[in-house]
Swiss-Prot record:
GO CC annotation, single: cytosol
Gene label: gmk
Keywords: ATP-binding, Cytoplasm, Kinase, Nucleotide-binding, Transferase
Cellular localisation: Cytoplasm
Organism: Sulfurimonas denitrificans (strain ATCC 33889 / DSM 1251) (Thiomicrospira denitrificans (strain ATCC 33889 / DSM 1251))
Annotated protein name in UniProt: Guanylate kinase
Length: 206
């Protein structure tokens, strides 16, 4: 069996779970990959760079892209739009790369529905709700109201952890990174069901 198709690795988790830190920790160690940069209407934060962390656009621009079917998936989170562009993802998959998504539970459900055969999903969580609150407050980037909304969203997201292939509890960055590297390697060799079925059909051929 000669498996050359690219693969998808979805990473989800509450804001404050440490997804960005975890990705930064492993990105140079998991081989040839493409990190999908989401488009968003939320305000740019201090230290972020347009086109590196996100593609920042206005709400009217985002809605126009929806009409033009520009997105593989999109969702509204905390009153802001987030979406994943189709073209660069298709190009990366065609070249055999591991495509990494940092998306929410809604986005994961859409990706699984459309590309589940080549998708491995990981939910990243802080060890406790109190630890999540501590991390959000330490960032000093959100108001008290925004933090409360993020916490309520996190509670809802935690109810959908069972939809994922793996759960990483990010209470130790190095240990969490070690686990994610192993999962990324496994994602690369996941075989689509159509290829498995072809192999089974041809297995007895002489």
């Amino acid at each position: 069996m000669n498996h050359k198709t690219g693969a998808i690795l979805v990473l989800s988790g509450p804001s404050g779970a440490g997804k960005s830190s975890l990705i930064k920790e492993v990105i140079d160690d998991i081989g040839e990959c493409y990190f999908s940069i989401s488009t968003t209407t939320r305000p740019i934060r201090e230290g972020e760079v347009d086109g590196v962390h996100y593609h920042f656009v206005s709400e009217s621009e985002f809605k126009k892209d929806i009409e033009d079917e520009f997105f593989l998936e999109y969702a509204v989170v905390h009153s802001n739009y987030y979406g994943t562009s189709i073209k660069p993802v298709k190009k990366a998959l065609k070249s055999g790369k591991l495509v990494i998504f940092d998306i929410d539970v809604q986005g994961n459900a859409t990706i699984i529905n459309r590309l589940g055969d080549i998708t491995t999903s990981v939910f990243i969580s802080p060890p406790t709700l109190s630890e999540l609150k501590k991390r959000l407050e330490a960032r000093s980037t959100d108001t008290k109201d925004v933090i409360e909304r993020r916490i309520e969203m996190a509670k809802r997201e935690m109810q959908r952890v069972s939809e994922y292939d793996f759960l990483i509890v990010n209470d130790n960055l190095q240990e969490a990174a070690k686990t994610l590297r192993i999962i990324a390697d496994a994602a690369r060799v996941k075989i689509p069901s159509n290829e498995i079925n072809d192999f089974v059909r041809s297995w007895e051929d002489i």
